[in-house]
Amino acid sequence: MKDKLVKAIAKDGQVRIIGAITTELVNEGVKLHNCAPTAAAALGRMLTAGALMGTTLKSEKDTLTLQIHGGGIAKGVVVTSYADGHVKGYIGNPTADIEPNSKGKLDVSGIIGKNGNLLVIRDMGLKEPYIGQVPIYTGEIGEDLAYYYTVSEQTPSAVGLGVLVDKDLSIKSAGGFIIQMMPGADEMLADLISYRLEEIPSITEMISKGMTIEEILEYIFEDMDLNILESIVPEYRCDCSREKVERALASIGQKDLKEIYDEGKEEELKCHFCNKAYTFSHDEIGDILESYYNEK
């Protein structure tokens, strides 16, 4: 099933929905970072969440960054997403892996940890980005995001995220949804949706059966006048460049940059999001010193 993200409403706009199949997107990210199974599930859930949430941005220049740091062996997960559905991310420890949990599922909470925070950072080109922060609720990511929406944005929400890792460490299926009740929505409608979400199979199970994202949402919102508003293709894409990495190198400060230059060696920097390596020769480091700090 090809990746696809849709925005929809139901019950005359009382319910707002974003849903996606992200199997290929997650597979790309997991391969880039060479993730162990549990790390793959954690990164995949965050990438899916990022793709869903990024499409709520108003401008193509805006960015949304999700961070979760719970003190666990995953050493945090960071994802940045954009309005067009493209996303990039990394996990601090791609080898993080532990035994399955009591339900026989990959123990994402066990590697994320619960001693920390979930951050949602929206950079809309203003002087300061908007930062929303909540304590980690379960470490399973989906429930943490639902808690964030309810507490930080006062929007009752259900967030479902799933990643099914195959035996060869490829991603068999991945996807998710965000369902939000709009102001003034019928409370009985919210109860009905909650009941249905408890009764349906997991999103990875439905994707594995060959259901499209539209069919999944039609199944959840049967008899609720589901209306698909738009669809896009989400993808994993890193926008790093030599110029951006050069700016990052310059940002370490004049003193540290001068020390690197005085060592007379080349410096290699890797992009966190795609692992691409950028090498700067001794002369190039000198040029950066001169360009940014008028020193060599």
From Swiss-Prot:
One of its GO terms (molecular function) is protein folding chaperone. Pfam families: HSP33. GO terms for biological process: protein refolding. The keyword Chaperone applies. Disulfide bonds join 238-240, 271-274. Belongs to the HSP33 family. Transmembrane segments: none annotated. It comes from Clostridium botulinum (strain 657 / Type Ba4). Keywords: Chaperone, Cytoplasm, Disulfide bond, Redox-active center, Zinc. This is 33 kDa chaperonin. InterPro entries: Heat_shock_Hsp33, Heat_shock_Hsp33_C, Heat_shock_Hsp33_N.
